[in-house]
Structure formats: structure tokens, C-alpha cells
Amino acid sequence: MDLLQILLAIAGLLAILLLQKQWRTKTSPGAKAGRKLPPEPAGAWPVIGHLHKLGGPNPIYRNLAEWSDKYGPVMTLKLGMQNAVVVSDREAIKECFTTNDKALADRPPSSIGLHLGFNYAAIGAAPYGPYWRDMRKLVLLEVLSSRRLEMLRNVRISEIGTSIKELYSNIIRSSGGSGPAKVVISHWIEQLTLNYILRTIAGRRFSDDSSKDAQYVKGVINDFMYFAGQFVVSDVIPIPLLRWLDPQGHLKGMKRVAKEVDTMCEAWIQEHVQRRMREKPGPGQEQDFIDVLLNNRDVMRKAQEEIDNHVGKERWVDETDLKHLVYLQAIVKEGLRLYPPGPLGAPHRAIEDCQVGGYFIPKGTQLLVNVWKLHRDPRVWSEPEKFMPERFLTRQAEVDVFGHHFELLPFGSGRRACPGITFAVQVMHLTVARLLQGFDMTTPSNLPVDMTEGPGVTMPKAHPVEVLMMPRLPSALYEP
């Protein structure tokens, strides 16, 4: 039974709730006071709302973008039995994260927060309040502060260096030492990301993913990311029987993954404690960029020329060089504009009544920011569908990705913005710079990369991208 059949069955069994829904609408604060609510697309059904119209081959953010063209940049959406507001233009989003930042700082309850967020203990899923404020302060001071990121600098440099050398060895082995070799770049990015995480939080890495431990850890992390991006029907149709039946099987999967993550992290903690007892203290989104560069070879060549001019070919680019690589920075910004990590961002919830774009937003309403639509607004971006890093060297030169410019919000804005922005940007810049400096890249038969999005919360590619890679630096730089 697919999702649409499940929704239709629920609608048929529970249509009687429509009367209750109508009564609630008539007695809601907005209705009683005659306040202006955001426009709502036609076609909402009892109980399931607009869910049946959000299915199909197109990603949800594309469907919502089409609706916003018709109904406006602030519109109401019925997510099952929950009311949501979707915003998609700079002015409305700025109002959300400035004037109404506190009013919209909450997170809606969800199965993801309950199970994968360990009963909302994770900072990203925690409701707004004293606990979240204390956790955010702890994370910013002890994990993501400038001092801590500087302490982790050697980890970043070491891991990207080791991973590049492993990539070089694989290319030489596959090509026999001459000519390019075919690489599925997403697999290398996944391995690099896994080792970044492991070295940062557990002080360990895997040289490849063939070992039993590596396969297990990678499987747990992949499962975690998969279920973190799944839609759970009972979240928006909160009927106990539906949660108990778990028709999609997602709740069972989330509970299993949560136990595996807990067991894995506990083992790492114990290993770390034992190591600290034995030792004395000592001093202490990249795939999209490559894919889009393969479709824009002139941009890739300009970035390589910039690196060659500022760094040369006798040493590897370092973090201290990045501030001089302005074209590379523009490439990263443009990649994040076209392919943000979360095209719909993380959901918010109103903890009090507020106004957005002249519309009344009642307490308890969910807020969705269509970042994908925002980043393609033709009123802000000339030729918005085109990959043009040069825009960030001219008209939009002052625009950054840190949540201060409301036309570019790949990591969110306001008090619930991603706290790891600085770390993420550092890693992306260094990874892209080293790949471009170290390798010439093209596609088999010089065909364009298929950028079609697959299902998921982070705009994954529908088809793995194969890249022909060839080293472009002296061989001594790749040696261990």
C-alpha cells in the first residue's frame, strides 16, 4: 500500500472530523477577529489537507514554488490536520527572522525529534526554551567557538590531505599510472565526510569502507540521514491508532537507528575515556559543487588558474590561502544558492500570534521557508537558473551565507540558524580548493552531468555522477 492509498483510506475513515475542523476554523482567533489569513491553495481534503497534492515525481519544494507563483510569497498550507505557512520571498523571510524571530523560534513536535533527537535532546529538534538556550550556549562555547575550531584545524587539514592522497592512489591504481581514471565522486565525498565526523567526535578514521567496522558505522549514519528526511504521516495526522499501526514503517526504523547510534556513541565515549586514562594530554554539501563545475568547465578553469596564481603547484592550498581565493569563494556561494543543504529548511512553529507580510499567523502554526524558491527569485537574481559565480564578484559581492542577507540563506537565519555554519564553510572551501588544485576533471564522453534531484531532504542526485580524474600536481605532493 503506497502513501496515497494510506491517505485516501484515512480520509474515508475520518471524514467526520471535517465538522470539528470547520468548527475550529470558525472559532479560531483569526476567524473571530476577522483577521486576514494568508491565501490557501484550493483542493485541500478533510483530514489529509493538501498532502495528496504534494506527492508525485516533483520534489515538494518545486510544487510549493509553483503554488507561490499563483497564491503569493506567503500562503497557508494544510499539512494533514496541521496548519502551516510557507514563505518564499526575501521581505517576508526577513520579517520572520528579525521582527518575529522569537515568536517563530519553536520547533514543531515530530517523530524525528522524538526518536532520532533522543526525546528532543538534540539542539536542532529541541523546543524553544531554557534547555535549548543552555544547549546552544554550550555548543557555541565548547564545540563551535573560534578557539575550538582553531584547535580542530589540524584535524581538517590532516583529513583532507590523507583523503586526497588515498584518492590519488586509487586513480593511479585504476589507470595504471597514465591517463584519467573513473571515480564516483559521491562515494569519495561520503568517505571524507564520515572521517571528518569520526575524527572530530571520536578521534578515529577508516582508510576505506571495506572493513566490517567501517561498513557498520557508515550504514548507521546513512540510515540516520535517510530516516531524518522521511515524512511521517502520524506527525500531521496525530491519531494514536495511526502511530501504533506505523503503516510506513518509519517509526520502527527510527527507533532501531536511535538504539544503534546510542550504542555506537557509548562505545566511542568509553574508548575515549580509556585512552585519556592511558595517555597524557597533548596540544590540543562538496559533491554539488563538483557536479555543477563539471557542467561549467570555464568556471573550473578560472578557479584552477586563481589557485595556481596565488598558491602555485609546489605546495597544497591551505586555509590561510582561502581569503585570497575570491573566485573560489564565489563558486561556493553560487553552489549553495542553487543547491542549498535543505531546500525547505528546518520547520519552525509560532509560540505566539504574529504578523508576516500583512497576514495574521496564529499561535501553533508551522512555518516552512522555501529556500529553493528564494534562491531562484528573478527579482533578486539575474538569470537565477544559471550557474554564475561572477554575480558574487559584482552586484552581490557583499552577500554572504551566514544568515545576515535574506536573499541567501542556505543555513537558515535568526536564533535557530545552523550553529555549525562557520565549520561547514571552512570544510567546503578547503575541500573544493584541494580537489580543483589537485585534479583535472571531466565527464565520460564529455556529457553534461544529470542534475536531476532524487528523493530526500538534501537534494541528492537521482543518479550517481561518474567523473574522470587525473592528477595535475607533482607526484611527490600526493605521497604519504
Curated annotation (Swiss-Prot):
Temperature dependence: Optimum temperature is 30 degrees Celsius.
rRNA processing among keywords: no
Tissue specificity: Mainly expressed in roots and, to a lesser extent, in leaves.
Membrane topology label: Single-pass membrane protein
Protein name as catalogued: Vinorine hydroxylase
Positions that bind heme: C418
Function (record text): A cytochrome P450 monooxygenase involved in the biosynthesis of ajmaline-type monoterpenoid indole alkaloids (MIAs) natural products, important plant-derived pharmaceuticals used in the therapy of heart disorders. Catalyzes the hydroxylation of vinorine to vomilenine, an intermediate chemical in the biosynthesis of ajmaline. Supports also vomilenine isomerization to perakine.
Cofactor: heme
Keywords: Alkaloid metabolism, Heme, Iron, Isomerase, Membrane, Metal-binding, Monooxygenase, Oxidoreductase, Transmembrane, Transmembrane helix
Record note on biotechnological use: The strictosidine aglycone-producing AJM7-DeltaHYS yeast strain expressing pathway genes of the VOM module, RsGS, SBE (GsSBE, RsSBE1 or RsSBE2), RsPNAE, RsVS and RsVH, accumulates vomilenine. Additionnal expression of pathway genes of the AJM module, RsVR, RsDHVR, AAE (RsAAE1 or RsAAE2) and RsNNMT, leads to the production of ajmaline. Ajmaline is an anti-arrhythmic alkaloid commercially used as an efficient drug for the treatment of arrhythmic heart disorder.
GO molecular function, one term: heme binding
Any one cellular-component term (Gene Ontology): membrane
Regions that span the bilayer: 3-23
GO biological process: indole alkaloid biosynthetic process
pH profile: Optimum pH is 6.5-8.5 for the hydroxylation of vinorine. Optimum pH is 4.5 for the isomerization of vomilenine to perakine.
Organism: Rauvolfia serpentina
Annotated family: Belongs to the cytochrome P450 family.
EC code: 1.14.14.104
Location of this chain's protein in the cell: Membrane
Enzymatic reactions: vinorine + reduced [NADPH--hemoprotein reductase] + O2 = vomilenine + oxidized [NADPH--hemoprotein reductase] + H2O + H(+); vomilenine = perakine
Keyword Oxidoreductase attributed: yes
Pfam families: p450
Pathway in which the depicted protein is active: Alkaloid biosynthesis; ajmaline biosynthesis
